[in-house]
Regions:
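Active-site glycine-rich loop that binds ribose-phosphate moieties when present
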Residues: 154-171
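Hydrophobic faces of well-ordered beta-strands that scaffold small-molecule active sites
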Residues: 1, 13-17, 60-64, 89-91, ...
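Acidic (Asp/Glu)-rich catalytic clusters
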Residues: 4-11, 47-57, 78-86, 133-138, ...
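Generic structural signal for well-ordered alpha-helices
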Residues: 4-5, 45-50, 78, 114-121, ...
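Flexible, glycine-rich active-site loops centered on histidine and acidic residues
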Residues: 71-122
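Glycine-rich, proline-tolerant flexible connector loops at the mouths of alpha/beta enzymes
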Residues: 6-43, 94-108, 173-190
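Catalytic cores of alpha/beta
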Residues: 70-83, 160-164, 189-195, 212-218
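Active-site pocket-lining/capping segments in soluble small-molecule metabolic enzymes
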Residues: 94, 107-140, 145-154, 161, ...
Length: 233
């Protein structure tokens, strides 16, 4: 909570809470078989989000990802969020898992963020993974998706990347949160291209405060972005 305390003086409208995949640990059983166990050594996204909201009174936007989760896992997380009054969610595919060269979805999960958006939108209509429909209870999630002013690293080109974003909005996304970008001109150009493509939902620039010089090298490598020369110097 120390980091949140330092941000309070700026009166943030909301705080994003990222989602980290659980670690996988293999153990050897006495009979020589290998067992895989999912491990987590810190609180999860839902718990952290509720704690920040309740302790500081700041709106939170928990991230929810496809990676490592089945549709039922995702549904459980959404049920908890809805019960706790966490009604904003950023729907993402997520990064590759450990030792993965390419993204590998859970066998019962989603391959793309658009499918996650569809699942959340379905829950807003009272529709669940097993086909049951609850007419008396609909969740009220506001769904955010990621946009990439500098193109997603896996996209063929900027045009196809924008088409994917338009599809996510058409599937039920209420707003776009951009990938980290420190170039105002690039952000404005991206928003202009979104409007030309028929994407009329709000587009919120994503900015991460820089706290160390090392991040000037680490962030471009991690997020496939460019830093303006003025910022580097």
């Amino acid at each position: 909570f120390t980091t949140i305390e330092a941000l309070r003086e700026f009166d943030p409208a909301f705080i994003n809470v990222t989602f980290h995949r659980e670690s996988i640990k293999e153990t050897l059983t006495p009979d020589g078989h290998i067992e895989w166990h999912r491990m987590r050594r810190r609180p999860g996204t839902v718990g952290i989000s509720a704690a920040i909201r309740d302790r500081f009174g700041i709106e939170v936007v928990p991230h929810l990802i496809c990676g490592g989760l089945s549709r039922y896992d995702i549904e459980d997380a959404l049920i908890d969020m809805d019960f706790l009054g966490l009604h904003n969610v950023l729907a993402l595919r997520g990064d590759c898992g450990p030792n993965e060269r390419h993204f590998m979805p859970h066998p019962q999960g989603h391959s793309h963020a658009i499918d996650l958006v569809r699942q959340i939108a379905a829950m807003n209509r009272g529709e669940f993974v097993d086909g049951e429909v609850e007419e008396c209870h609909h969740s009220k999630f506001s769904i955010g998706v990621a946009g990439y002013p500098e193109k997603h690293v896996d996209a063929l080109d900027a045009e196809s990347d924008l088409r994917h974003l338009k599809a996510k909005v058409d599937a039920g996304a209420d707003y776009v949160m951009t990938q980290i970008c420190y170039d105002a001109d690039r952000i404005l150009a991206f928003i202009s291209r979104c409007r030309e493509a028929g994407i009329d939902v709000p587009v919120i620039p994503g900015v991460k405060p820089l706290s160390t010089l090392r991040q000037l090298t680490l962030l471009p490598e991690t997020f496939a972005i460019e830093l303006p020369e003025a910022l580097r110097s």
